[in-house]
Amino acid sequence: MEVQLGLGRVYPRPPSKTYRGAFQNLFQSVREVIQNPGPRHPEAASAAPPGASLLLQQQQQQQQQQQQQQQQQQQQQQETSPRQQQQQGEDGSPQAHRRGPTGYLVLDEEQQPSQPQSAPECHPERGCVPEPGAAVAASKGLPQQLPAPPDEDDSAAPSTLSLLGPTFPGLSSCSADLKDILSEASTMQLLQQQQQEAVSEGSSSGRAREASGAPTSSKDNYLGGTSTISDSAKELCKAVSVSMGLGVEALEHLSPGEQLRGDCMYAPLLGVPPAVRPTPCAPLAECKGSLLDDSAGKSTEDTAEYSPFKGGYTKGLEGESLGCSGSAAAGSSGTLELPSTLSLYKSGALDEAAAYQSRDYYNFPLALAGPPPPPPPPHPHARIKLENPLDYGSAWAAAAAQCRYGDLASLHGAGAAGPGSGSPSAAASSSWHTLFTAEEGQLYGPCGGGGGGGGGGGGGGGGGEAGAVAPYGYTRPPQGLAGQEGDFTAPDVWYPGGMVSRVPYPSPTCVKSEMGPWMDSYSGPYGDMRLETARDHVLPIDYYFPPQKTCLICGDEASGCHYGALTCGSCKVFFKRAAEGKQKYLCASRNDCTIDKFRRKNCPSCRLRKCYEAGMTLGARKLKKLGNLKLQEEGEASSTTSPTEETTQKLTVSHIEGYECQPIFLNVLEAIEPGVVCAGHDNNQPDSFAALLSSLNELGERQLVHVVKWAKALPGFRNLHVDDQMAVIQYSWMGLMVFAMGWRSFTNVNSRMLYFAPDLVFNEYRMHKSRMYSQCVRMRHLSQEFGWLQITPQEFLCMKALLLFSIIPVDGLKNQKFFDELRMNYIKELDRIIACKRKNPTSCSRRFYQLTKLLDSVQPIARELHQFTFDLLIKSHMVSVDFPEMMAEIISVQVPKILSGKVKPIYFHTQ
């Protein structure tokens, strides 16, 4: 109660003059109810003033009314005949009776009884407490009869408040607002339970006192035995506080004898078995009071250590158990475990420390390391990543500095063994990753027990045995005989062990910064690109969606390959007129004029000079002329006599040297080579099967657009029939992408991972996660062949162009003759590129054999990928993998022809 401070003394302020808020009036009414309990069986009043004097007057009136009603009941019972009483007892309703605010039966709204009902008999052995009126009737030998309820007095009061009379007597004298609030706040259910418990306890204690002869006070009978007014007041205050959303920290502590309810949200913390569902009201106050109670045998230090969000939280992060000493069962549990149904009441940091302390999402089983331990149980917060060092023994601890894209392909451990590698124990091989099969382990698994210092294998078809047959029909260099990835061409000089960093783009430490001199001649938008920095060349939007190929002369959009260079139509016509004409052009400046789309007509001299620098010649209008020129020279050499044989050889050598000095064909291939394409994969999201495969399909869609543009710019390709052009591209796109990806993996990451795109690099973990591990291993082995054979960029460009013409339908194309001629011309160009670097014919033949064997090895890999993509397209809806429209059309229409045998590849060697 609020007080006023006077000059020299403290005196209470009159309640009638006190100004309070809504909640202050509520609790003031509750306090007045507690201080003035009222009669034993009060009746509900419509309203009560806050003053104490008015409450006393109203209570006296209620007592007088109650006495009058009791007298009327006795008179009616005397007038009622025994036969009518028996009939009323037989016709009584069997349902459970509820007491109203004046002791009447409270019936449901749907039931309208036509006659009064008799109350059920009260049995003391069942724990029932008879009503006072019933006790009077029993003493006189009359059956108990309940009067009919009044019509108007009690109709305004809520029906649920009728249950509060026997247990909380002071509630009847409170205001009507309090009753409405308690009814709306769902506090009645809790008070009903407490009423039943109080009645049962009161009956048992009353019987014990009667047996011992001890007198029973009116206060004990009134509150049900051992309960007191202060205890009931505390329960009511706490129930109202919780139901109104107020804090319960300021309430009084529970007595040491009170027990903790099992349906409390804190009950599992203290070892109490939880109930089916926690109640929202008073149990929280009871549990809170019991947790804050300082009982005997519990120190202050233990009580201070309870709070799970303060001191215990720090200990939980350090790996210690969160102790809770709020009850006697706290010492036995010793661990703070919150139930899963109460996730809204707990902090995420409580279980993250214990769940993530020994968990690493990147301790995945790699192909060249020992078998990992069983994975930890799943966690609801599995999307959170913790990049801790790998902790799988000696072979795994060596990769502690590896990042997310780390690969253990270069680690050499004596105990590392993969499936099918002859591990000493069967348990080691059985605990290998589930995606490994027996065939995959033998064909593509890591080499177990390689010679020298290597236990790591190449992951390809070659095993670790000395007498293994080379799959490509040739002998690899001595440093690659053991199948070790990191042994060829001294990769550590330019490829450190850091692999690819965690950022979605490769870091400068893992990318070969020099592309070679073969890209210097192409000054297009992507020809002078250097992968020295990670984000300089990938952030612009035109990198993800590259524009059309530009003219090498003026930078305008190119219309095709003209006179040996990729140019626009304007520069094509200008070069033809300027080269064939006899007019000489002179520059008015210093021969360094800017030639672009808007200023290309300002200086014809600089424009013509730039055309020659790009490799444009009148003799390169058609690729046939070069072949015909060589055949003509060979025919002339064969028809001449022996004295002129030396002269013919000199002409042939001079022709080859001139061709090497002006590589028209290579200039075209270098100019039309597609740039780097990104997949748009979000590396910040967790790796999943659907995400990886959807990104691969999106990358295939983007690369397919570049393949079409690249094929149309190839010399001689437009001379094919239009249907033949479409068919060749649709049949060979998979092999072209695999071959180009193998080259990128060799040049960027030294064939240790699959470099699909700068933002989509597959390490061992992603290979397993994508469920195409065997195909990925074969593609990685293809990439390793570029290093073992030391493929030059010129050889790669020519082999890639030849790969376009390496698969046709069984029935043939519409213009099969011209297709065969075009394919033969590209084969001759590959032979010329080989002959430019080698003088010995035997060496040239061996090199040609190796390169053609490598081309043949692409076809089986492409067929496996065709089968995989076709099966994935059928199940795409079930596995949530997205397919772009063009990719889905090609896979659904053209791939079945390849799988059914209607379209077959052209092999150089017998398979």
Swiss-Prot record:
Composition skew (Low complexity), residue ranges: 44-88, 192-214
Phosphotyrosine sites (modified residues): Y222, Y266, Y306, Y345, Y356, Y361, Y362, Y392, Y526, Y543, Y907
Region (Disordered): 35-164, 192-225
Region of interest (Interaction with KAT7), residue spans: 616-910
Site positions per UniProt: Interaction with coactivator FXXLF and FXXFY motifs: E889
Cross-link (Glycyl lysine isopeptide (Lys-Gly) (interchain with G-Cter in SUMO)): K385, K512
GO cellular component, one term: nucleoplasm
DNA-binding positions: 551-623
Function: Steroid hormone receptors are ligand-activated transcription factors that regulate eukaryotic gene expression and affect cellular proliferation and differentiation in target tissues. Transcription factor activity is modulated by bound coactivator and corepressor proteins like ZBTB7A that recruits NCOR1 and NCOR2 to the androgen response elements/ARE on target genes, negatively regulating androgen receptor signaling and androgen-induced cell proliferation. Transcription activation is also down-regulated by NR0B2. Activated, but not phosphorylated, by HIPK3 and ZIPK/DAPK3.
Subunit structure: Binds DNA as a homodimer. Part of a ternary complex containing AR, EFCAB6/DJBP and PARK7. Interacts with HIPK3 and NR0B2 in the presence of androgen. The ligand binding domain interacts with KAT7/HBO1 in the presence of dihydrotestosterone. Interacts with EFCAB6/DJBP, PQBP1, RANBP9, RBAK, SPDEF, SRA1, TGFB1I1 and RREB1. Interacts with ZMIZ1/ZIMP10 and ZMIZ2/ZMIP7 which both enhance its transactivation activity. Interacts with SLC30A9 and RAD54L2/ARIP4. Interacts with MACROD1 (via macro domain).
Protein name listed in UniProt: Androgen receptor
The organism of origin for this protein: Pan troglodytes (Chimpanzee)
Gene: AR
